UniProtKB/Swiss-Prot annotation:
Residues 18-376 are extracellular. GO terms for cellular component: membrane. This is Ig-like V-type domain-containing protein FAM187A. Keywords: Disulfide bond, Glycoprotein, Immunoglobulin domain, Membrane, Signal, Transmembrane, Transmembrane helix. The gene is FAM187A. Belongs to the FAM187 family. Residues 267-361 form the Ig-like V-type domain. Glycans are attached at N317.
């Protein structure tokens, strides 16, 4: 009996030791390349992405990430402290923030939040001494010129383009989940620009032979110019899925409802948390869905009206005052009184939050340079003063010239 128990304990200890060895040798199974290569990766602007450091020597306790705009550039950014301990929370990152405030290092991987097109370049995983183990060629494609294609209207994506041996095309991601449930919703898939050519640099890793994203550093300048007009796409179609039955009423709220219902009236209880905001008449407003990222399926409703992308997506109509951008934010330009109401936000097919908007035409609001409208007013005022000053100086300069050379007596004082 004791022999059997001892055998079982030794067997269990051996399994545990095996698991520990496996965890410790995770980087031994992926040897670092003898010649540094660049793995191509493409993303849409405002998205967050992760770059794993797939290999490193066992004796290296922490990695340091470096960034170069172009290979061999004399200017290299160090993206961490030299112990690899820089941490950034995604919720604290704002659109347009500097790269050094939009990244994080976790488990040797580099996380970049709300990437911008200027973040495109080469990322190196290495040591504080500048020894590189793994590298990425990252292409962040701008969403400003993004083209929307609506399948329900019979529209088709861009056709492939051919320029001799150069083949330019769109590669689509998977469809998102339906953005609403219980009612007609929408789902979409993002398409990024890729090209195929035998003239690409051999130093860049390719998932498919001779195929990389259009903004890759592997693409020669002359080929990149030809592919410049092939913008990212978003393909949109309708969908309909049932809602999952969940109990959303909390016990405390339920007790209040039962108490009030005994009195004879049942109060209105919102399905989701509601936030109140009061906006000045004629000023702009941008609403973000809590916890949503650009790659999520996000939808917006105003009261009982569904704001579908087929009508409200940015770029559908240039004169739109209310629209949804490609980062899933709802924009209201020049707020009007009829914009008052509750704006509901769906995330991944679930109703998650409400935003009650009130519009006021009066009230005291201190001016601040953080307000874009205040900055615009100051800029226009300064430009006006500069123009008036330029005209004034020009007139007096001409009068002085005429007076000195007696060429224009009528201007003499």
């Amino acid at each position: 009996m004791h022999l059997a128990l001892t055998t079982v304990l030794l067997w269990a200890w051996g399994l545990q030791a095996f698991e520990i060895v496996e965890k410790e040798n995770i980087f031994q199974r992926t040897p670092c390349p003898a010649f540094l290569m660049f793995e191509n990766a493409a993303y849409l602007a405002d998205m967050s992405f992760e770059l794993p450091c797939h290999c490193k020597p066992e004796e290296v306790p922490a990695v340091v990430w470096f960034y170069q705009k172009h290979l061999g550039s004399s200017h290299t950014k160090v993206l961490t402290d030299f112990d690899g301990r820089v941490l950034t929370e995604a919720a604290q990152v704002r659109v347009g923030s500097d790269m050094l405030t939009r990244f994080s290092i976790r488990m040797f991987s580099l996380l970049v939040f709300r990437a911008q097109s200027e973040d495109s370049g080469l990322y190196f995983c290495g040591t504080r001494k500048g020894d590189y183990f793994y590298a990425y060629d990252v292409d962040i494609q701008n969403s400003e010129g993004m083209v929307a294609t609506f399948q329900d209207k019979g529209q088709e994506p861009f056709a492939d383009e051919y320029y001799g041996h150069l083949h330019v095309f769109t590669t689509f991601w998977e469809w998102t989940p339906c953005d609403r449930c219980g009612v007609r919703g929408e789902q979409w898939r993002i398409g990024l620009c890729y090209l195929q050519s035998p003239d690409l640099s051999p130093r860049y890793l390719k998932a498919v032979p001779d195929v990389v994203s259009c903004g890759s550093r592997a693409v020669p300048r002359k080929l990149r110019t030809k592919a410049r007009d092939h913008t990212p796409e978003v393909l949109v179609r309708s969908c309909l899925v049932p809602c999952e039955k969940t109990k959303t009423i909390r016990e405390g709220v339920l007790a209040i409802i039962n108490y009030v219902s005994k009195v004879g009236s049942r109060p209105w209880v919102p399905q989701v948390p509601i936030q109140f905001h009061q906006q000045r008449l004629g000023h702009g407003l941008i609403i973000s869905c809590p916890g949503a990222r650009p790659e999520h399926a996000v939808a917006w409703d105003k009261d009982r009206q569904h704001l579908y992308r087929t009508q409200y997506l940015k770029g559908v109509n240039r004169s739109m005052r209310v629209f949804i951008d490609h980062g899933n934010q709802l924009h209201i330009r020049f707020t009007q009184l009829d914009d008052r109401g509750i704006y509901y936000c769906w995330r991944q097919g679930v109703l998650v939050a409400g935003f009650r908007l009130g519009v006021t035409s009066h009230g005291h609001y201190p001016a601040s340079f953080s307000d874009p409208e205040t900055r615009s007013a100051v800029e226009l005022t300064l430009i006006g003063y500069l123009l008036i000053t330029a005209v004034f100086v020009t007139i007096h300069f001409c009068r002085c010239c005429c007076y000195l050379f007696h060429c224009c007596p009528s201007f003499s004082p």
